[in-house]
Amino acid sequence: GDYLRFSGKTGVYKLGRNDEPVDPDQLYLVEPKSFIQGWTCWKANKPIDRLVWSIYDDDELGVAEEDLKSHGPYRESAGEVWAEMLGTGLIACDAVLSEVLFTSTSKSGRNSIGKMMEDAGARSKVNEPHMPLIYFDSVTFEAQGNTNYKPVLRPEAWVTRSSAAAYLVGDLNLDQLVAGDKPKKRKARKKK
């Protein structure tokens, strides 16, 4: 799949190596089983090291900040640090069902992804549909006299795992998935 990045300076999402723009009208299906967390080490505005694990394996695989390998010296004023990261896997609801990974080390990005993780977990606990269909959006805010942007993962609908599976194999179309339609039961063949 492709990596999806968001710029807090421009408010633009960019997809893959060619920095393709993201269609604001494109729906994405979030896979809660793909939720990840970890650390990204930034030097000279580039990620030079990453540690990533499933949020469900945090107790066994999680790494504390004090246990991270040093890539110093760091220029903290230039943002050279190990930064916390959250992320999720998604599937574009397009003709090819492209797989995408969206991660963020910014506070606003982690807050947006973290909120979606919390909402999915809360819905799952009470047996409600817990797979969000989202649009990638953004909002502006002022910081130190500058206009900045934060990513917003805007849920259009929450769907069940069985409906999502039916959509992915073509048994439901996107409108039916958004509407919350249940997958059709396949008729069992009678043995002769």
Where are these regions (language model features)?
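OB-fold ssDNA-binding interfaces and closely related basic DNA-contact patches used
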Residues: 1-98, 143-170
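Polar/charged alpha-helical tracts
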Residues: 25, 115-122, 175-179
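Short helix-loop boundary/capping segments
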Residues: 97-105, 111
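Short nucleic-acid-contacting surface segments enriched for D/E, G, S/T with interspersed K/R
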Residues: 114-135
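Short, surface-exposed polybasic-aromatic patches that bind anionic ligands, especially phosphate groups
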Residues: 140
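Acidic, gly/ser/pro-rich intrinsically disordered tails
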Residues: 164-192
